[in-house]
């Protein structure tokens, strides 16, 4: 309740939390004194709502550890709109690192696709409180002989302003152990004369997708009655075999 002298103006302030839609405020004034211009006793003002949407993204690996080369696993990317407005033109982007090969991409609430390891998901609008998911299935490689770690980050953007952009990325890390497949083949002449020196060969191969480290091969030459003594400096060799590599060695013995 106020008392206003002739020509006096008093200004008051008020606050409110902006709604998702436009807001209209109406002020009225009355007095017990006769008012000769009652048409200006009501004033209206409008405020347009600028949409904002707090998007966040998280990324989870189905199997962060215990993977081996050539195995498969999946990443789940979850986008949440905490509002308060609908997020327009939402795009999820993920560049899967080399060493992980994208096999398939699918979306729940998102249109999904990929160009090689460049994965994306889009939706024209994501309502406040809504969730959308992008799933990426990958195969894993490791051509070395040590366990590797891969870090993969997904991000989300929208044409609607985001008041909290710090939660617009999500990261998952996975490890991949090497997996080799070593094999050996030994050959001898089909026939040899007793007392002669015979040459044989032994090959060591790696048919796996990872490097085989500290490969030890040996050849024991013998008959049904026992081992024959061979000549040379030894019959054991330590090797490193890269994927697809074959090494062939020779050995001799007296028949």
Protein language model regions, located:
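Exported/extracytosolic protein signature
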Residues: 1-255
């Amino acid at each position: 309740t106020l008392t206003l002298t002739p020509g006096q103006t008093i200004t008051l302030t008020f606050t409110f939390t902006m709604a998702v839609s436009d807001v209209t405020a109406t002020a009225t004034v009355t007095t017990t004194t006769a008012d000769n211009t009652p048409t200006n006793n009501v004033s209206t003002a409008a405020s347009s709502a600028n949409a904002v949407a707090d998007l966040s993204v998280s990324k989870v690996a189905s199997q962060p550890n215990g993977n081996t080369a050539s195995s498969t696993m999946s990443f789940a990317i979850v986008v949440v709109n905490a509002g308060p407005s609908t997020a327009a033109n939402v795009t999820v982007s993920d560049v899967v690192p080399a060493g992980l090969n994208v096999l398939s991409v699918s979306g729940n609430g998102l249109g999904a696709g990929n160009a090689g390891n460049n994965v994306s998901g889009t939706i024209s609008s994501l309502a406040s409180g809504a969730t959308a998911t992008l799933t990426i299935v990958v195969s894993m490689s490791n051509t070395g002989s040590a366990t590797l770690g891969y870090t993969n980050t997904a991000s989300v953007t929208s044409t609607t302003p985001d008041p909290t952009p710090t939660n617009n990325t999500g990261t998952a890390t996975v490890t991949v152990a090497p997996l080799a497949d070593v094999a050996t083949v030994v050959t001898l002449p089909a026939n040899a004369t007793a007392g002669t020196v015979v040459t044989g060969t032994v090959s060591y191969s790696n048919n796996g997708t990872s490097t085989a480290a500290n490969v030890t091969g040996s050849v024991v030459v013998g008959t049904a009655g026992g081992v024959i003594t061979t000549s040379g400096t030894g019959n054991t060799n330590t090797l490193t075999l890269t994927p697809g590599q074959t090494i062939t060695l020779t050995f001799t013995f007296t028949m």
